[in-house]
């Protein structure tokens, strides 16, 4: 335990994955500073640890360049108010978790005022808009990266960076028990299941629910006995998904589970999901998957000009190879998705499972403890 007067940590997490990382970090910092205060923007997991959230986290969970524009006045108001409140609070450190378009602007202002800043989860500067690294260097005292190849990129540009690994790799066992997950969820132990995960945000469901449920219908034509299960993060997403089912696949029976997305993945024989952190989770529970994603055409037209990578999903980026199928934008079509799922269900999973195990081991580093150690080290520097 670090002998120190009470510390104050300001933290901003912008979505569910950030809330998970934030909760792990808060927990580890509490071991070192039991009387510390944690304040900023966080979700239910962080708040359960005594974190004080000044705004609802979901206000920052907006997908796509075009979609952000309509929310821009509110986002700017939140950022301005947050910077003012944190400046007055004068915390020992500000930690922005992911949400780079929001957090790096906050970090820039706070660092200029003499507050130490950390950015937890490297923005994908190695993938697109690489010049952002210069702004990151100006905005942060240190970056905490989840992926091993990111640190090398920061080292090339002389930006302080610590690779900490990923909390999901620490939390998820090397073997995820399918039958135990099914028992927990009340699912048929003998059936074949496809987990359908069209995203946790409203904007994602708006784009992906239709092609995903239509693809599920097509899969059922080839596998008449297959069953479907979908996790939803809250009642609003449940209603949105039910509306899509009613409109696009009214005869499709889907078991809907609130929360427990990891258990749903573990219970499945194959997973259809949106790109993002969920793809890493699917890899760590060691299940075959198909990744599909689309955004508004304008957002895509802008983004594609800035992209520097051929793959989007985390398993493929970590492997530096296309080990899981990706169907993006124009390829996010029911028939193409269904064909990819059918192929996954029919092929031997053992070789891919071995790759998943190797990547899991690479990321298993006790991330929350390493991140907390890095923050403590930063606080101890002049």
Swiss-Prot record:
What EC number is given for this enzyme? 2.4.1.182
Q: Which domain of life is it from?
A: Bacteria
Keyword line: Glycosyltransferase, Lipid A biosynthesis, Lipid biosynthesis, Lipid metabolism, Transferase
Reaction equations catalysed:
a lipid X + a UDP-2-N,3-O-bis[(3R)-3-hydroxyacyl]-alpha-D-glucosamine = a lipid A disaccharide + UDP + H(+)
Q: What's a Pfam family this protein contains?
A: LpxB
**Hey, which pathway is this one from?**
Bacterial outer membrane biogenesis; LPS lipid A biosynthesis
Q: Name one GO cellular component term.
A: membrane
Name the enzyme group at the top EC level: transferase
Q: Which GO terms describe its molecular function?
A: lipid-A-disaccharide synthase activity; phospholipid binding
The family database entries (CDD domains) matched by this protein are listed as: Glycosyltransferase_GTB-type
Q: Per its UniProt record, what InterPro entries does this chain match?
A: Glyco_trans_19 (IPR003835)
Output one GO BP term: lipid A biosynthetic process
Q: What does this protein do?
A: Condensation of UDP-2,3-diacylglucosamine and 2,3-diacylglucosamine-1-phosphate to form lipid A disaccharide, a precursor of lipid A, a phosphorylated glycolipid that anchors the lipopolysaccharide to the outer membrane of the cell.
Q: Which PANTHER family match?
A: LIPID-A-DISACCHARIDE SYNTHASE, LIPID-A-DISACCHARIDE SYNTHASE, MITOCHONDRIAL-RELATED
**What is stated as this protein's family in its record?**
Belongs to the LpxB family.
Q: What is this protein called?
A: Lipid-A-disaccharide synthase
Question: What organism, scientifically named, is this protein from?
Answer: Shewanella frigidimarina (strain NCIMB 400)
Phylogenetic lineage: Bacteria, Pseudomonadati, Pseudomonadota, Gammaproteobacteria, Alteromonadales
Which gene is transcribed and translated to give this protein?
lpxB
